[in-house]
């Protein structure tokens, strides 16, 4: 499994290097324990502010296929219900996240919060420009949700840059 790092999913990689960090954001994050804390596997964490709900929006620099999600979190304060949305033109607000139908909904158990890959419906996550997670509640129903680490496992979609093509024959603008 060389070149796959710690993903433990054959043929896929951690997609963190494809994040467009300027386009990533989190709603209802606490000032002291913000969103960036959960993007690295470190002792810090992301924590919700006013209540247990969070909306995390991650954009990618190029289209990706997402196979699975990895979460590390406290067994009491970790997420329980997560709604996943893809390719939204704007970040969801909490009312929309509650009412819109997600691409997939995950109901997590404490054992899902140990950092092992949680498989997604791969066919539904094929051409992903951005993904938004609505964390509806946490394991214990406490006021704050915490996430120590969040990552997506998948692969980049090869894109064609039309500027890289060279004319084969004929003159510019000439048809067959």
What are these regions, as identified by a protein language model?
Residues 43-96, 122-176:
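Aromatic, loop-rich ligand-recognition surfaces of beta-strand-rich domains
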Residues 1-59, 168-176:
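Disordered, acidic Ser/Thr/Pro-rich linker "stalks" and the adjacent N-terminal cap
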Residues 97-120:
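Extracellular carbohydrate recognition and processing domains
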């Amino acid at each position: 499994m060389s070149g796959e790092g710690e993903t433990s999913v054959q043929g896929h990689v951690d997609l963190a290097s494809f994040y467009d960090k300027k386009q990533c954001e989190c709603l209802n994050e606490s000032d002291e324990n913000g969103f960036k804390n959960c993007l690295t596997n470190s002792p810090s964490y992301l924590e919700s502010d006013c209540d247990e709900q969070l909306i995390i929006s991650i954009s990618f620099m190029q289209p990706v296929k997402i196979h699975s999600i990895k979460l590390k979190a406290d067994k009491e304060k970790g997420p329980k219900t997560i709604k996943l949305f893809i390719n939204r033109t704007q970040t969801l607000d909490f009312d929309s996240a509650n009412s819109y139908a997600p691409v997939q909904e995950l109901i997590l158990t404490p054992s899902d919060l140990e950092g092992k890959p949680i498989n997604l419906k791969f066919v539904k996550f094929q051409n992903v420009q951005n993904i938004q997670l609505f964390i509806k509640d946490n394991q214990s129903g406490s006021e704050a949700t915490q996430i120590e680490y969040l990552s997506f496992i998948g692969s980049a979609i090869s894109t064609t840059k039309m500027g890289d093509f060279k004319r084969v024959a004929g003159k510019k603008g000439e048809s067959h």
